[in-house]
């Protein structure tokens, strides 16, 4: 007899917002979502700030969202941990950071700092760079070179000059530090093995072959004149006495989110790197704020805090089968992040990875691989052996990042079509679905004056539970979704999962 599956369906980057202006969620024709919304119990929950372990007012993101969802509790994020360590002064006593700087002093070499230069708070925060500069000053380091990656995605598209000016003011205040290279994140922070992009950033960082400008500001302004926004600034070298990353130097990469920092780190700190021909740096001390992946030989500044009793582990302990399914862009989120930072499958878990389309930007193909994800899931459901499904549709977020309204509307409409087939199939099997999101984005893709808005939002996300006859609590947070799943599965909630089921009892 076929099992009755319970599914968590995450519409990535899909939140509630009253105004229709620039709101693809409201403007899209989504008959299936609306049908479930009108028929079944609904509520909305918080997906940003303190509710997900981020600083107050900080927008959520997919990594944080899936970590909180899977853990069933508030998970204090790297950003919050690092901020706290700087405030407490522990940061300046950190062994790894002090060893990194001791390496510079003992080799009479240079300190290179890599990172995304913005206050977006998704991958990094430039105030962490300032703390590193203060530490270097205290320890008497003379040669400090900043390799800045420009954002324009988690912050305004053309905001780089503000961060550059503030950083240069910090250089002047401390009497150390200068920009050595500048790259748009499109090049320096790829995550899809597009090595031809990373190679451009690498060449600028190593001071090999890249355009050169007298100042960081001059290079960015020249890029603006060519019609480029921050994200797409072609890597360039800033003229100074720096001759790139050399033998005996130290690199500290201050991005705390791994997925877009891993590839560049592999080029420098993975001896087996094969993406393109590189000249290895000898005796390089390479430190990263968090662990990016197992291939990178790096000292870790902030070690991971282990999370036990995530939704996947509880399913395993109760002999339940589970499926994790998404396309490439969100596959790490339904696996690694949903499992609290664990790569290995649980017993009874299987995974389906559907390739994301190879296009320059997803507004060119708003449906992405949603139909293929849907087909793969229907195939899995037909096996009749699943207890728990965790599914992510990437489109509202990935297309929302383009800041283009029409493609984002199309993205949501494609997802809605797939949602209808999937949920109806689950209902036919006497199963349940929770339809929700991990953070906002597509709910606002234009600013009030019609400029593209490519960032996430702090708006609450909807929750639909396809079980008639129950009432949902009026508010909650992402950490309440796993307890709600356990409630539907009739599985006891362990003590360290401190969220509460959204179903009133």
From Swiss-Prot:
Quaternary structure and partners: Monomer.
GO molecular function: manganese ion binding; phosphoglycerate mutase activity
GO cellular component: cytosol
GO biological process: glucose catabolic process; glycolytic process
Cofactor section: Mn(2+)
Binding-site residues, substrate: 123, 153-154, 185, 191, 257-260, 330
Pathway assignment: Carbohydrate degradation; glycolysis; pyruvate from D-glyceraldehyde 3-phosphate: step 3/5
Keywords, alphabetical: Glycolysis, Isomerase, Manganese, Metal-binding
Similarity comment: family membership: Belongs to the BPG-independent phosphoglycerate mutase family.
Name of protein: 2,3-bisphosphoglycerate-independent phosphoglycerate mutase
Catalytic residues, chain numbering: 62 (phosphoserine intermediate)
């Amino acid at each position: 007899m076929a099992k009755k599956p319970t599914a968590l369906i995450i519409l990535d980057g899909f939140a509630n917002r009253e105004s229709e202006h620039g709101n693809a969620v409201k403007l899209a024709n989504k008959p299936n979502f609306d049908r479930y919304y009108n028929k079944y119990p609904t509520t909305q929950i918080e997906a940003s700030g303190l509710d997900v372990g981020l600083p107050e007012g900080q927008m959520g993101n997919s990594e944080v969202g899936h970590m909180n969802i899977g853990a069933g509790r508030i998970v204090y994020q790297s950003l919050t941990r690092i901020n706290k360590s700087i405030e407490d002064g522990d940061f300046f006593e950190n062994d790894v950071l002090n060893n990194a700087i001791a390496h510079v002093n003992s080799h009479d070499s240079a300190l290179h700092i890599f990172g995304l230069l913005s206050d977006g708070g998704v991958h990094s925060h430039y105030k962490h760079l300032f703390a590193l500069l203060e530490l270097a000053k205290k320890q008497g380091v003379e040669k400090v070179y900043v390799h800045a990656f420009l954002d324009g995605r988690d912050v305004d598209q053309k905001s780089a000059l503000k961060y550059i000016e503030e950083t240069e003011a910090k250089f002047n205040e401390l009497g150390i530090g200068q920009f050595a290279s500048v790259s748009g994140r499109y090049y320096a922070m790829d995550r899809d093995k597009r090595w031809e992009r990373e190679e451009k950033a690498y060449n600028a960082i190593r001071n090999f072959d890249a355009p050169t400008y007298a100042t960081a500001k001059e290079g960015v302004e020249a890029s603006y004149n060519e019609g480029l926004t921050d994200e797409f600034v072609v890597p360039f070298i800033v003229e100074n006495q720096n001759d790139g990353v050399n033998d005996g130097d130290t690199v500290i990469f201050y991005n705390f989110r791994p997925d877009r920092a891993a590839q560049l780190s592999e080029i420098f700190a993975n001896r087996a790197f094969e993406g393109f021909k590189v000249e290895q740096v000898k005796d390089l001390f390479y430190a990263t704020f968090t662990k990016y992946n197992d291939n990178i030989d790096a000292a870790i500044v902030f070690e991971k805090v282990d999370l036990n009793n995530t939704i996947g582990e509880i399913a395993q302990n109760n002999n339940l089968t589970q499926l994790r399914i998404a396309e490439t862009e969100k596959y790490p989120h339904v696996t690694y992040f949903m499992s609290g930072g664990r790569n290995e499958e649980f017993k009874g878990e299987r995974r389906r990875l559907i390739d994301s389309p190879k296009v320059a930007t997803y507004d060119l193909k708003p449906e992405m691989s949603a139909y293929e994800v849907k087909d793969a899931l229907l195939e899995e459901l037909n096996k009749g052996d699943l207890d728990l499904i965790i599914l992510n549709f990437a489109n509202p977020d990935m297309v929302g990042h383009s800041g283009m309204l029409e493609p984002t509307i199309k993205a949501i409409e494609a997802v809605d079509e797939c949602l209808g087939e999937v949920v109806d199939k689950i209902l036919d099997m006497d199963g349940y679905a929770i339809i929700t999101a991990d953070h906002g984005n597509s709910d606002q893709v234009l600013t009030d004056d019609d400029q593209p808005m490519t960032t996430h939002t702090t708006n609450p996300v909807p929750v639909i539970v396809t079980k008639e006859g129950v009432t949902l609590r009026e508010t909650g947070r992402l950490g309440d979704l796993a307890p709600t799943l356990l409630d539907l599965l009739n599985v006891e909630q362990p003590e360290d999962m401190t969220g509460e089921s959204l179903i009133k009892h």
